[in-house]
């Protein structure tokens, strides 16, 4: 069930919070945003699934950057093995102690393949199971794109396909007012996500967090998302 973009709109059937981030993850500019999300998670155990990265050193590097970043914030970090290499290990790492799942950026098409592709779909199913049980998910760039109902795959010719539909609409990472990297349908709801900024969607409301001016487009009109307050 997706989440509608409305100011402090009451939401139902949404167990774990989501954070849609615009990119430049694990950099100093993202510290306060990620600290906020971690504090809202059910536990300080963060599991990193870098499925948007290429197999091998790219995946390992993304996990290492996430580990360093979140350990500085006080989290216990679980480095989830690449499901394309060790599916059983990845599933075992996503246990019930996890309070936050982190999806770094990279290839949105590649991440979607990892989460719903026949060979590794069990990881996506486990992610959704944990989310329904109250586990938060924070996705940056490709990670945010995949969580939405629709996503653009710039690495697959720029086509628009179905995402996980944990949030309504389509995410535009690396966004700033007045810019557009991709063509999008006029009637589609859009999330404008600046680098080191984003939106938190929880059981009660939708709020902006981090840098820039995270915004939402509904009925063709852009409006800023109200700021998160403690």
Regions picked out by a protein language model, each given a short descriptive name:
Residues 2-43, 48-64, 68-71, 151-230:
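C-terminal and late-domain segments of enzyme folds
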Residues 19, 79-80, 102-103, 137-140, ...:
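General beta-strand structural signal in soluble alpha/beta enzymes
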Residues 30, 83-84, 119-120:
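A conditional alpha-helix N-cap/helix-loop micro-motif detector
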Residues 32, 36, 89-90, 126:
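A short acidic, amphipathic alpha-helical/loop segment
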Residues 42-46, 97-98, 134:
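A general structural motif
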Residues 53-116:
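Portal/gating segments that form or line small-molecule/metal binding sites
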Residues 103-179:
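Class I SAM-dependent methyltransferase SAM-binding "motif I" and its flanking Rossmann-like core
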């Amino acid at each position: 069930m997706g989440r509608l973009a409305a100011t402090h709109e009451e939401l139902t059937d949404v167990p774990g919070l989501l954070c849609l981030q615009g990119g430049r993850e694990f950099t100093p500019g993202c510290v306060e945003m990620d600290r906020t999300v971690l504090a809202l998670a059910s536990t300080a155990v963060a599991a990193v699934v870098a499925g948007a990265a290429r197999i091998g050193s790219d995946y390992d590097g993304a996990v290492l950057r996430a580990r360093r970043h979140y350990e500085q914030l006080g989290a216990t970090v679980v480095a989830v093995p690449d499901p394309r290499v060790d599916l059983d290990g990845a599933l075992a790492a996503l246990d019930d102690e996890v309070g936050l799942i982190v999806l770094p950026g990279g290839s949105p098409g590649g991440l979607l393949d990892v989460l719903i592709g026949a060979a590794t779909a069990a990881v996506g199913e486990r992610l959704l199971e944990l989310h329904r049980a109250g586990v938060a998910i924070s996705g940056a760039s490709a990670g945010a794109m995949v969580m939405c109902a629709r996503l653009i795959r710039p690495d697959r010719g720029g086509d628009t396909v179905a995402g996980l539909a944990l949030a309504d609409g389509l995410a535009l990472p690396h966004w700033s007012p007045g810019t557009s990297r991709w063509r999008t349908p006029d009637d589609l709801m859009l999330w404008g996500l600046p680098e080191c900024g984003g939106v938190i969607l929880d059981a009660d409301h939708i709020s902006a967090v981090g840098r820039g001016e995270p915004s939402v487009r509904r009925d063709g009109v852009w409006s800023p998302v109200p700021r998160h307050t403690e």
